[in-house]
Swiss-Prot record:
GO BP terms, alphabetized: tRNA wobble uridine modification
Species the sequence originates in: Shewanella amazonensis (strain ATCC BAA-1098 / SB2B)
InterPro entries cross-referenced by the UniProt entry: CmoA, Methyltransf_25, SAM-dependent_MTases_sf
Listed EC numbers: 2.1.3.-
Signal peptide segment: none
GO molecular function annotations of the record: carboxyl- or carbamoyltransferase activity; S-adenosyl-L-methionine binding
Pfam families found in the cross-reference section: Methyltransf_25
The keyword Transferase is annotated on this UniProt entry: yes
Function: Catalyzes the conversion of S-adenosyl-L-methionine (SAM) to carboxy-S-adenosyl-L-methionine (Cx-SAM).
Keywords recorded for this protein, A-Z: S-adenosyl-L-methionine, Transferase
Keyword presence, Transferase: yes
Sequence similarity: Belongs to the class I-like SAM-binding methyltransferase superfamily. Cx-SAM synthase family.
Matching Gene3D superfamilies: Vaccinia Virus protein VP39 (3.40.50.150)
Full protein name: Carboxy-S-adenosyl-L-methionine synthase
């Protein structure tokens, strides 16, 4: 299924209220995230490369908040012949429907199980890789520690958690600089001032970012002794944590 161009916020007053991963967003999400998140394609490709290095035969992989299935597809392409299973989980039915359609276009011997569920209710077992690709930031902050602790418990020794997030910064000047660079990135990708403003208003109470230090502290408290940044562009970053 092809993705449409993102024009959801192109007209004044469109889609007022909090941002939701509904059918309208699902239809344009592929275009939206590439034009909004610097380095997104690199992150997706590297998720596949990390999977190639860490997914062990017969183990489980969890893609939490799988959206359109980009990470799931990148992983599946790299782990053929390992008898591993991928659980692609999202609480948005429109997203999950499109993810399943997207992956059905490619033949693979790796089983993918699509689950319409709240990732906070997910159990983890025999996991070699868990992916939270721009997902944790949408959970209530009070629920984040518990989820990461459960992920850690379900990972096999040597298993990896890959965590991508939008960051906030303690330094006011640094925050302003990186926000400015990110805005220019979106302008360069064709978003108007109106679109940028309206989406910001819709998402600011839904996406609640943490600092890098908060992420590292949370991962350490969950049990990870090795957790560090592997990618950052402006205020978007990805971390790898190894059990």
């Amino acid at each position: 299924m092809t993705n449409q161009q993102d024009t959801l916020f192109a007209e004044p007053g469109e889609h007022q209220g909090n941002f939701q991963f509904d059918s309208r967003v699902a239809g344009v999400f592929g275009d939206m995230i590439r034009r909004s998140v610097p380095g997104y394609t690199q992150i997706i490709n590297t998720i596949g490369e990390i999977a190639d290095r860490c997914v062990t035969p017969g183990s489980n992989v969890y893609d939490l908040g799988c959206s359109l299935g980009a990470a799931t597809l990148a992983i599946r392409r790299k782990i053929e012949g390992r008898n591993a299973r991928i659980f692609a989980i999202d609480n948005s039915e429109p997203m999950l429907v499109r993810a399943e359609e997207n992956l059905s276009a490619y033949v693979s011997d790796t089983k993918v199980f699509f689950q319409l569920a709240d990732i906070r209710d997910q159990t983890f077992e025999n996991a070699s890789l868990v992916v939270l690709n721009f997902t944790l930031q949408f959970l209530p902050p009070d629920d984040r520690d518990t989820l990461l602790a459960r992920i850690y418990q379900g990972l096999n020794p040597g298993g990896i958690l890959l965590l991508s997030e939008k960051l906030k910064f303690d330094g006011v000047d640094v925050q302003a600089l990186l926000d400015s660079l990110h805005l220019d990135f979106k302008r360069a990708n064709g978003y108007s001032e109106l679109e940028i403003s309206q989406k910001r208003s819709a998402i600011e109470n839904v996406l609640i970012p943490d600092t890098l230090e908060q992420h590292k502290t949370r991962l350490n408290q969950a049990g990870f002794t090795q957790a560090d940044l592997w990618f950052q562009c402006f205020n978007f970053a990805s971390m790898v944590a190894i059990k």
